[in-house]
Each structure stands twice: as C-alpha cells, then as structure tokens.
Regions:
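Structural signal for hydrophobic packing residues in well-ordered secondary-structure cores
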Residues: 81, 85, 100-107, 111, ...
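Residue-level signal for inorganic ion chemistry
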Residues: 56, 77, 92, 114, ...
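Short, often N-terminal, low-complexity regions
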Residues: 1-3, 8-11
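ALDH superfamily catalytic-core signature
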Residues: 251-394, 458
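Rossmann-like NAD(P) dinucleotide-binding subdomain of oxidoreductase/dehydrogenase enzymes
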Residues: 148-287, 415
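Conserved C-terminal structural/oligomerization subdomain of aldehyde/semialdehyde dehydrogenase
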Residues: 55-61, 241, 278, 332, ...
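N-terminal Rossmann-like NAD(P)+-binding subdomain of aldehyde/semialdehyde dehydrogenases
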Residues: 9, 16, 20-153, 347
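Short, well-ordered beta-strand elements within core beta-sheets of diverse protein domains
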Residues: 59-65, 80-86, 166-167, 277-279, ...
Length: 499
C-alpha cells in the first residue's frame, strides 16, 4: 500500500492517513515509558486494553507504570533541575522550537491516532493534532517577551522556577494537554514528570517519540503512563515534586489538592464546568443557534467548556426550540472518519453508560425531550455513540442542569429578564466558561462582566491562546496559557540590599 502523497492530502483524501496507520500496526503493544531521556520497560506489569470507541474493538495494549516508576521519573527530573533551571531564555526558546518542529512532523500520525483511539470526528481530530504543536509555538512567544527580573521599589524581584513539576493530563485532548503543560513548565525552567491518561497511550507514544527527537537533556521531561491511584498519587504526594498541574474532574482535583497540601505544593487545577450560553432577546437565532449547538456538542460533548445550559428568553422559547430541532436534525453522529460527522463516540463504555443514565434522569425529573434521547443514533449498531440530545422545560435545580454530563446532552432553560438570566447562569458550583450572544455587542459585554466564569466568549467560539484560561469556584485554581500560565511555574524572590 503506497504512502500518502502531498497531492492526495491536498485533495482531502482522508482515508489515506488511516490506511498508513493500519499498515504500520493493527494491534499495538506499548510496553515502554520515558525516563531520564530513554525509553524503558516499566517496573509495573499491569496490562491495559486500548479500544477504538467507534467499533468497541481492542486496538492495542499498554503496560502501565507503577509507583516505583513514578519515583524513578521524579528522581530523574530532580537530578536534571539544577542544571536546566540555570539555562537562559534563548536556550529554552531553541528547545521549544525543536519540540514544535518535532511534534508538527508527527501531525498526520497523531491525527489518525486521535480518530482511532479517541473517536474524534475528522475536523476536531485535525484541530487537536495541530493544537499539540501550536501550543509549543505559543509558549515560545510568551517566553521571548517575558522578563524574569523586575524592580519593586528598591528591591530586585526575580521570577524563579519552582522545581520538579508533576503534570497530570486527561483523555479528551491528550496530546494538546501534554504539550501545553510541558511547554509552560520548561519555559519557566522547571523539569517535569507527566502522567497521561492510560486510555490515550497510542497518542502518548507518538508525542513522546516526537519530544525525544527534539533532543532535550536527559531527565528534563519524563512520561509515565499509569493509573491515577498509583502513579498519580505518587506524583501528588512525593516531597520532591514542587508543582502540580492537573486537568480533569472536580472530584479528582479535590483529591489532588488535599494530597499536595501536606507538602504545600503549588497547584494549578483546571476542572469541570457547566457552562451557560446566554441568548439575549435581541439575538438573531439563524446566526446564534448553530453556534450554540457547536458550543454544546464540541468534542462530542466531552469538553469541560461545552455550553450545556442554554438560556433563552421565555417569550421566544417556541421559536428557539424549532430552530434547535432543525439544527440537531442535521447534526450527524456516527463514524468519526466521515467528514460530515459532528459528534463521535464516547471514549469508553463507562462514559457511554454515564451519559445514558443522565438522559434517563432528565426524563424522570420532568424535562421534555425535543431532540435525541436514549440509545444509539438510528442506523448505528456498534460503538459508544450517543444520540445528540436536547431537553427543554429544564429548571436549574434539575440534575441535568447542575451536574457535568460530559456528553452531547444540552438543556434549554428560560428567563424573564436579563437579571434573571445572569442569576441562573451564576447559580452553579462551576465557573469555567460562559457564552453570551446578542445583536448588541456592548450589551453582551455588560452581561459578560457580571458572569462568574474564567472566560466569557461574546458572539464567538474562537480561542485566544494568549489569554488566561481557568475557572472560578469549583472549576479550578490558577490559570493556564500566556503569561499567566508561565508564571504558574515560577516563584517570585525579592532581593534587597545595596549593590
């Protein structure tokens, strides 16, 4: 079978990338972790099956690291820190450039793995593969502009790297989180131990190979794939880890925060969300509804920033529902390799069952289905697919309006006036992201200023990598991206005295 040619890629021959992956290996055995600049066999001996969520077939197996492997990785990072922390900006910028080029060169391979192992639809999968390299480029720009020394009165303030950073990443955008957290840590002068999700081992292998090819000093970064209760717990409690950065559920984030408190680790947590989408009464529904549905179903609903609570004016509810029903009817759920697919499978059977349970709860609590419902989409017999689902007549005390579902299930709530819309939006434990849509940008920004969320998107779904990202309330602690993300790995030291 021939390799993909440039012309084939330019003609959007999507199948070619997947054919190359299949040719290389149908069943992958991943039996190495990365410690001290080398691929090594884990001390742990547990084997974990990897599934294609679109077919429910086993596509690989990974040998998991254990607590001893985590300790070895932490020791390697600790040994590397004294030398690496003294490197200059230019040296670290050059490293980030090499990392960017190496990950970029793996884009097609990573894209295919994301679609096969995670089930991301092709458009989302391509963005995720590109994001893995672009975050390295963004970190390079931030580092280039950053001043590590500044004045405060008579004092010199030096921003100093914290030490060994433990980076714990989720399964819903494995490569991007690995590269993004690592880029910020290295830019600051920290060394790192990364624990990716065991469900993303194929993607992790590709990223690890790319980062190895970038030629960083041994021990500067280490990647140990294992379970949270073993590897994650060791990283969270080890006295030689100075910094923790975790993305995942609020429940696990609280556990990590408690574990790190014993040694007063600096902690960044990017946790769950229940993002409101406020549609103001002057909004053009023809423009807004497609954006609202995209916000809710992004990443097949498996996104902490998904806009899952849609707030609409009571007097326009019927009009909004009709437009939503039409939009969801044309939202294809199914084979992630099909360019027309917008919603792929849930990552696992456990996640599929979780989403089905919430759909049943919504019906039991009196919400009214206007699209979707339980079970798989019509014509789909296998795979962990969910019917894109929208409930109306939802009140903010219902379970589906309060708990993070992490699937393509949206709730429509109504409000009488703007003050009530804001009150409903803020009546949640979460505060990660919010969306406001209005024909009047000034009015939308006024509403945005009153929302309790780390990010508010006004009349857009666009991402800004230079802006801080993180949550209010139980959506997290600290910020990632841009200068804020860099400084999460730095500690200010004041130096006073006569020169």
């Amino acid at each position: 079978m021939p390799d993909c040619t440039a012309s084939q890629r330019n003609r959007a021959d999507l199948s070619c990338v997947f054919q190359n992956l299949i040719r290389e290996a149908v069943m992958q055995m991943i039996d190495k972790i990365y410690i001290d600049g080398a691929f090594v066999t884990p001390h742990g001996d547990e084997l974990f099956d990897l599934f294609n969520p679109a077919t429910e077939q086993v596509i690989g197996r990974v040998r998991l690291a254990d607590a001893q492997d985590a300790c070895d990785a932490i020791a390697a990072a600790k040994r590397a820190f004294p030398t690496f922390s003294r490197t200059g900006k230019r040296e670290r910028i050059d490293m980030l450039k090499r990392m960017h080029e190496a990950v970029l060169a793996k884009e097609d391979e990573l894209y295919a793995a994301i679609t096969e192992e995670y089930g991301a639809p092709v458009s989302r999968g391509r963005w995720m593969a590109q994001h893995a390299s672009s975050v390295l480029l963004e970190a390079e720009k931030v580092l280039d502009d950053y001043a590590f020394t500044r004045r405060a009165g008579t004092a010199e303030v030096v921003m100093q790297p914290l030490g060994v950073a433990g980076l714990i990443t989720p399964w819903n955008s494995d490569a991007g989180f690995i590269c993004g957290k690592l880029a910020a840590a290295l830019a600051a002068g920290c060394t790192a131990v990364i624990k990716p999700s065991e469900m993303s081992a194929i993607q992790t292998r590709i990223v690890t190979e790319a980062l190895h090819e970038a030629g960083l000093p041994a021990g500067v970064f280490n990647i140990v794939t294992g379970r949270g209760e073993t590897v994650g717990a060791q990283i969270s409690t080890h006295p030689d880890v100075a910094k923790l950065s975790f993305t995942g559920s609020t429940v696990v984030g609280k556990t990590i925060l408690r574990a790190g408190a014993e040694t007063l680790k600096r902690v960044t947590l990017e946790l769950g969300g229940k993002s409101p989408v406020i549609v103001l009464d002057d909004a053009n529904f023809d423009e807004v509804v497609p954006l609202a549905i995209q916000a809710g179903f992004m990443n097949s609903g498996q996104a902490c920033i998904a806009g899952t609570r849609i707030l609409v004016p009571q007097h326009r509810l019927e009009e909004f529902e009709a437009r939503v029903q039409k939009e969801v009817t044309h939202t294809q759920a199914g084979d992630p390799r099909d360019p027309q697919t917008a919603v792929g499978p849930m990552v696992s059977q456990k996640q599929w069952e979780r989403v089905q349970r919430y759909i049943r709860i919504g019906t039991d609590e009196g919400a009214r289905l206007i699209a979707g419902g339980p079970g798989r989409p019509d014509g789909v017999d296998a795979g962990w697919f969910v019917r894109p689902t929208v409930f109306s007549d939802v009140t903010n005390d219902m379970t589906i309006a309060r708990e993070e579902i992490f699937g393509p299930v949206l709730s429509i709530l109504t409000y009488r006036d703007t003050d009530e819309a804001i009150a409903i939006a803020n009546d949640t434990l979460y505060g990660l992201q919010a969306y406001v849509f209005s024909a009047d940008a000034k009015r939308a920004h006024e509403v945005a200023s009153r929302l309790e969320a780390g990010r508010v998107l006004v009349n857009t779904l666009a991402h800004e990598p230079a802006a801080p990202f993180g949550g209010f309330k139980q959506s997290g602690i600290g910020r990632e991206y841009g200068t804020f993300g860099l400084e999460a790995f730095l500690e200010p030291k004041s130096v006073l005295g006569v020169l």
